[in-house]
């Protein structure tokens, strides 16, 4: 009925969210989960699964419209606009008990705002670093490496990168597919696509993806 879903919620992005959160993040009821890029196909799915597991979920997205969608339509407890000047203060207020799981999709200032809030034995599945993908070289300013590694050491954080199709046993995909189909059918998980018409528009669609101009999973429709 929705063949494009095999590129999104029932494909690599959905599977990434499922495996990264459940197998690396290992969420427990009552924990606080923070999700970067919360309206993207991975982030949106991570947050909704975390809610199903009984967690408090705080999203981070770009712009008031995206943040409203995350709370009103996806059921997150809160969403912080990373474009505002006091993002770190707002994130701290939204996470009064600290952060137990941070699902990393972006890096940059979002990561730096999360670090001071990580609880002991927090888990950090590292899925992407989109804020740093197009850097021409090392950033100017303070080297944040010591702060990042110091927090990981001091707070005993489990930080694990993963590439979905070579980090988990093939049998996990069937488990994911069964669970996700059930959640989609009963409305527990909602899914949004950003459809672009025409192959000639694919390059611009990709550029918009890198700067957060998309709203949902970017799909190029070719007749």
Task: Locate each region found by the language model.
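Terminal helix/beta-alpha structural elements that buttress the NAD(P)+-binding lobe
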Residues: 1-223
């Amino acid at each position: 009925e929705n063949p494009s879903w095999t590129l999104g919620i029932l494909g690599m992005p959905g599977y990434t969210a499922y495996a990264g959160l459940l197998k690396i993040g290992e969420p427990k009821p009552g924990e606080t989960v923070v999700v970067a890029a919360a309206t993207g196909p991975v982030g949106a799915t991570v947050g909704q699964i975390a809610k199903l597991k009984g967690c408090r979920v705080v999203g981070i997205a770009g712009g008031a419209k995206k943040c409203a969608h995350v709370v009103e339509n996806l059921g997150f407890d809160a969403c912080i606009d990373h474009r505002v000047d006091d993002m770190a203060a707002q994130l701290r207020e939204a996470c009064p008990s600290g952060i137990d799981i941070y699902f990393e999709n972006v890096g940059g200032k979002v990561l730096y705002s999360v670090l001071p809030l990580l609880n002991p034995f927090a888990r950090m599945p590292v899925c992407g670093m989109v804020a740093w993908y197009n850097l021409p070289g090392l950033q100017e300013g303070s080297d944040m490496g010591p702060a990042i590694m110091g927090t990981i050491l001091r707070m005993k954080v489990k930080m694990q990168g993963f590439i979905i199709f070579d980090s988990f046993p093939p049998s996990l995909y069937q488990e994911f597919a069964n669970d996700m189909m059930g959640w989609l059918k009963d409305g527990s998980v909602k899914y949004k696509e950003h459809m672009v018409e025409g192959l000639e528009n694919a390059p611009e669609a990709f550029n918009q993806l890198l700067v957060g101009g998309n709203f949902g999973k970017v799909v190029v429709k070719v007749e």
